[in-house]
């Protein structure tokens, strides 16, 4: 047997076929085991960008199941806390880490170079801790008081959060030459943003009705304003700021989708 035959036999089998980018998005954005994918390559993750909202839908579906189970056992407040914890665990806290690093840097009021250095530091400062407390507390509070709207909110918010990442990657320049943003932009293909946006628009309408479309519009507005601020402040966006965009977008989505009477009427 030749060495080429041996290598061929040992090569992992790609079960996903043309849907491999969806698997790559899940592998990158969650802790879910994703068997049957080839070894991760530099271009694999950027080429999965148009499927980030689909990965968000998977996250939302899992959270819906967790929330249903928690609701059977406990009251709405406990269910909300369980959901927020499960949310962080399911995504390995990746976006939360970016949130804390971003606010430690941009709220330090130092030079651009010093802010980027602070964001590289793995230690959490006061501003990062405050940002984490605010985001986690708001998520739990919105879900605890959502009534029946919690289900729509928890399914759709991760979709809108991942779309915010796609918008940030496509719309704003990377702050570092060798950073994650540069890697993403190097492999962007025509139609990536359009594909992600069409999927997000459809999911927002199907899951949330008119309320979902309003949530998407508000997420876009906040994401754009934050992207402009951080681009002016840092010279572009980084992997940390993408995480922050996702977390803040999720809070905006939850705030909109859990408005008591108006959003429930619009969703019907």
Swiss-Prot record:
Catalysed conversion reaction: alpha-ribazole + adenosylcob(III)inamide-GDP = adenosylcob(III)alamin + GMP + H(+); alpha-ribazole 5'-phosphate + adenosylcob(III)inamide-GDP = adenosylcob(III)alamin 5'-phosphate + GMP + H(+)
Membrane-spanning ranges: 54-74, 80-100, 124-144, 150-170, 202-222, 243-263
Cofactor: Mg(2+)
Keywords from the UniProt entry: Cell membrane, Cobalamin biosynthesis, Magnesium, Membrane, Transferase, Transmembrane, Transmembrane helix
UniProt-listed GO biological process terms: cobalamin biosynthetic process
Pfam families in the record: CobS
Functional summary from the UniProt entry: Joins adenosylcobinamide-GDP and alpha-ribazole to generate adenosylcobalamin (Ado-cobalamin). Also synthesizes adenosylcobalamin 5'-phosphate from adenosylcobinamide-GDP and alpha-ribazole 5'-phosphate.
Name the UniProt record assigns to this protein: Adenosylcobinamide-GDP ribazoletransferase
Record gene name: cobS
């Amino acid at each position: 047997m030749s060495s080429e035959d041996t290598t061929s036999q040992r090569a992992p089998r790609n079960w996903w076929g043309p849907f491999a980018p969806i698997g790559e998005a899940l592998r990158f954005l969650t802790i879910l085991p994703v068997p049957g994918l080839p070894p991760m390559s530099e271009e694999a993750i950027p080429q999965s960008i148009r499927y980030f909202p689909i990965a968000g839908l998977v996250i939302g579906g899992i959270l819906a199941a967790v929330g249903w189970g928690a609701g059977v056992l406990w009251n709405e407040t406990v269910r909300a806390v369980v959901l927020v914890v499960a949310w962080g665990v399911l995504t390995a806290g990746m976006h939360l880490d970016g949130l804390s690093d971003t606010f430690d840097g941009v709220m330090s009021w130092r030079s651009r170079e010093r802010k980027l250095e602070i964001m590289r530091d793995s230690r959490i400062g006061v501003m990062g801790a405050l940002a984490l407390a605010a985001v986690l507390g708001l998520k739990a509070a919105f879900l605890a008081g959502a009534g029946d709207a919690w289900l729509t909110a928890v399914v759709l918010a991760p979709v809108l959060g991942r779309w915010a990442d796609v918008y940030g990657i496509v719309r704003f320049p990377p702050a570092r030459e060798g950073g994650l943003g540069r890697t993403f932009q190097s492999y962007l293909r025509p139609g990536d943003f359009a594909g992600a946006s069409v999927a997000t628009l459809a999911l927002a309408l199907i899951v949330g009705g008119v309320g979902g479309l309003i949530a998407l519009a508000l997420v876009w507005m906040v994401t754009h304003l934050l992207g402009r601020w951080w681009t002016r402040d840092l010279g572009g966006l980084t992997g940390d700021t993408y995480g922050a965009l996702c977390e803040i977008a999720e809070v905006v989505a939850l705030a909109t989708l859990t408005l008591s009477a108006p959003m429930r009427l619009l969703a019907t």
